[in-house]
Amino acid sequence: EMGAALAQAVQSDFGDDLAGKRVGILACSQSQRSMQQRYTGVSQGLRESGAVVEWSLEGKAESIKDAFYTLEQDKPVDILIALGNDETEMMVDFFAGDELGWRLDRCSLYGVGSSEKNVYYLDKGWIQTLVVPNEFNMGYQSMEAIAKQLIYHMDTTRSSKVNYLVVDREHLYDADIQKVLFPIVQ
């Protein structure tokens, strides 16, 4: 669902017609089912709108950095989508190191993440939309599942749905978004 939400944010920003728009995806490690679902959701949503996924890179942020720099030179894109927090931070670092952002003028960044750094750059306008997983709730769900397994001696694990918010610069300071971004302060 998070991937589909990113695709919808891109479609909304570009008027649902992405024909001819070139997209690059930083897909994180695809060994986790949740990451596979994010990738499937975003790539299907973009293709249905006419966008061309020029390339996608799989792996952890540090391991794909060199490949990204090469691809960015050989196959520049109009839209960058980072499916994980570290990958979104890597893109922000990439933009920051570029003579004050000529790439920002021709490339829109969308990502998943909740770090202070990503929220700061969303507020600054470098990230167009950030999908923010409710990590506080995710931790609660995990502890609840562990407690039930210990109490009832269950061996099975099941998937849980993680809630998330789609945040753009305009709505960053809305009360419901602030509760998710800064749960301890509340």
Annotated model-derived regions:
Residues 21-31:
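Short beta-strand segments enriched in small/hydrophobic residues
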Residues 42, 59-119:
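Hydrophobic alpha-helical
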Residues 2-6, 33-51, 90, 94:
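Short, solvent-exposed amphipathic alpha-helices that sit
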Residues 8-16, 43, 47, 69-76, ...:
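Sec-exported extracytoplasmic/periplasmic mature domains
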Residues 19-22, 47-53, 75-79, 104-108, ...:
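Loop/turn elements at helix/coil->beta-strand transitions in domains of secreted/extracellular proteins
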Residues 134-186:
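Hinge/cleft segment of the Venus flytrap/periplasmic-binding protein
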Residues 23-25, 42-62:
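Short beta-strand elements in bilobed, periplasmic/extracellular small-molecule ligand-binding domains
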Residues 1-20, 65, 113-118, 133-151:
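Hydrophobic alpha-helical segments within soluble ligand-binding/sensing domains
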